[in-house]
Amino acid sequence: MTVPETLHRIPRRPWRWLPWLLLSQLAVVLAWWAWGWAIGLPLMVASHALFLVPVFLPNSRFYAPVLSHLPAPAGHVWLTIDDGPSEETPAVLDLLDRYQAKATFFMVGERAAARPERVRQVLARGHDLGNHSHRHPQTRFWRLGPAAMADEIAQCQQTLTGIAGTPPRWYRSVVGMTNPFVAPALKRWGLTRVGWSARGFDGVDCQPQAVVDRIVAQLRPGAIVLLHEGAAHGHNLAIIEAVLQAIQARGLSAALPLRPLSGAHPPIAGGSSSPATPAPTTR
């Protein structure tokens, strides 16, 4: 599987936020010195919030570029499935085959190492892989330091590469959180961060129909759809099938991006090349 260069968003300046952090703290010090704590303290809180809030915004590009929507070639969406491989993976693959759909599976390194045959099944059925961290530390991913973050991304990348034979080129943050130390690791491994534009919150305990309704409301050509497998609530297979049915009912198809020929617009797997279109939204 190759990656279209027009979609590849490797961070070029992973520390670009640092000068702004230093300037903001200098402004806080000067304000505190000039006007006292009544001005300095609120300014300090605001300056810290400015750098903390983007960590929790899945499609924020404050710390790293993000691909949140594809160019809109007629009739296609990008289906992405997180948190595998799991015991449900074969059933997910059967559903995708039934609806003639392709997906990118964002896999957790530890789980891939425990079920390498599932990873190979995904590839053998014509789907793609993405890096979704090695241990999926969802409660503390947002506060991992540089060494721990680098290790999470590196170990997953090495594990998936060892099983698949080729390195993944896509990355998705755990719960979409991206702190200042994600971008350096992405640059190191040549990874593009992928967000989403259609999400139903199926990774946690949920009402399946409510999840499907939320996703369907956001379905449009070029959408990046976020789904999960193997969640404890046991509804993922039903949700995936309902979303696949909705995609077909809307006259859409789930397909993977391919590398275009030189100077050509990136086609879609199973589709044909089309005229040049604007670059993807990266927000």
Language model feature labels by segment:
Residues 2-78, 86-94, 98, 243-244, ...:
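N-terminal pre-catalytic segment of deacetylase/amide-hydrolase enzymes
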